[in-house]
């Protein structure tokens, strides 16, 4: 990342994985109570921010299928501007790397990186807690990325407690299909009564490391997604025959964990033609963590 008084370049918006994802209830407003552990990855979209003197917020690059006015990045910048009353403006460039509809948190991470970067570029000095209170207005996953640490998540995903996770390498395989999150959450077959667990339960099992990630919990959405999307089912079956694996979020991406990059790359090299695989190392902290206190 490069930093100047007029711009912030090469700001990473890291992907996340759900190491497990349990749906424990449904609220009257339609939101779901969940439990999960969010893992940051050193892989994601890259954003660039340049000050404007006319006060406008503008997206300087096109994102196919995402109109500028509905882009979470633009919404995040405008929300921050309205909250603080700053007269500053910004041009935002987005180098998309993460596939959309993949369960990797791409749009949410872009929004969080925008909040953190503009907190620095616009010299706002908002606290992390204040940024998180804005982030929840943009989506359930956005507060996690502002939180900036690997976390045990509860509520709708906004109740976060830091967890220390071992350094690992991940292979993330994404079939060529977009899975709408709302469609999966509304499916009548989705399990919504999984028994709550504790952070101690997860840490005890994780530390044993036997067969991780599938040694603890499950992804309650995986069965619904694989029943509706054959492409995801094919990836799950193929990868699980090689190593323990699991779908992240509402899909479509499926991941496996390895102790070394070499092991992950070896499996990636054997992926069927046409499948998109990425190898990434775990992160313990968001690259822009220091941009809020």
UniProtKB/Swiss-Prot annotation:
- Keyword Transmembrane helix assigned: no
Signal peptide span: none
Q: Which GO terms describe its biological process?
A: isopentenyl diphosphate biosynthetic process, methylerythritol 4-phosphate pathway; terpenoid biosynthetic process
**HAMAP family membership:** IspE (MF_00061)
Enzyme class comes to transferase
User: What family name appears in the similarity comment?
Assistant: Belongs to the GHMP kinase family. IspE subfamily.
Which cysteines share a disulfide bond? none
Write out the residues that bind ATP.
Answer: 99-109
What protein does this entry describe? Answer: 4-diphosphocytidyl-2-C-methyl-D-erythritol kinase
The GO terms describing molecular function are: 4-(cytidine 5'-diphospho)-2-C-methyl-D-erythritol kinase activity; ATP binding
Q: Provide this UniProt record's keywords sorted from A to Z.
A: ATP-binding, Isoprene biosynthesis, Kinase, Nucleotide-binding, Transferase
The domain of life for this entry's organism is Bacteria
């Amino acid at each position: 990342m490069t930093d100047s008084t007029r711009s912030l370049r090469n700001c990473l918006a890291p992907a996340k994985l759900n190491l497990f994802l349990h749906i424990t209830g449904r609220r009257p407003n339609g939101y779901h109570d969940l439990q999960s552990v969010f893992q940051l990855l050193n892989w994601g979209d890259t954003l660039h921010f340049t000050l404007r003197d006319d006060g406008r917020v503008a997206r300087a690059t096109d994102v196919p299928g995402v109109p500028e006015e509905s882009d979470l990045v633009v919404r995040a910048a405008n929300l921050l501007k309205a909250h603080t009353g700053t007269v500053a403006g910004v041009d935002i460039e987005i180098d998309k790397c993460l596939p959309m509809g993949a369960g990797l948190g791409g749009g949410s991470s872009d929004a969080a990186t925008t909040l953190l970067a503009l907190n620095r570029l616009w010299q706002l000095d908002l606290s992390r807690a204040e940024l998180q209170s804005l982030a929840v207005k943009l989506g359930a996953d956005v507060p996690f990325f502002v939180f900036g640490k690997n976390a045990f998540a509860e509520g709708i995903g906004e109740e976060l407690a830091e967890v220390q996770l071992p350094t690992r390498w991940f292979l993330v395989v994404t079939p060529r299909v977009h899975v709408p999150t709302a469609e999966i959450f509304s499916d009548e077959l989705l399990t919504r009564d999984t028994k709550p667990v504790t952070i101690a339960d997860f840490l005890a099992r994780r530390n044993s490391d036997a067969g991780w990630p599938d040694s603890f919990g499950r992804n309650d959405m995986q069965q619904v997604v694989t029943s509706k999307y054959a492409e995801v089912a094919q990836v799950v079956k193929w990868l699980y025959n090689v190593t323990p694996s699991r779908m992240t979020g509402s899909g479509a991406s499926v991941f496996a964990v390895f102790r070394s990059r070499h092991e992950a790359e070896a499996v990636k090299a054997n992926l069927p033609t046409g499948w998109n695989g990425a190898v990434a190392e775990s992160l313990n902290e968001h690259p822009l963590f220091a941009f809020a206190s």
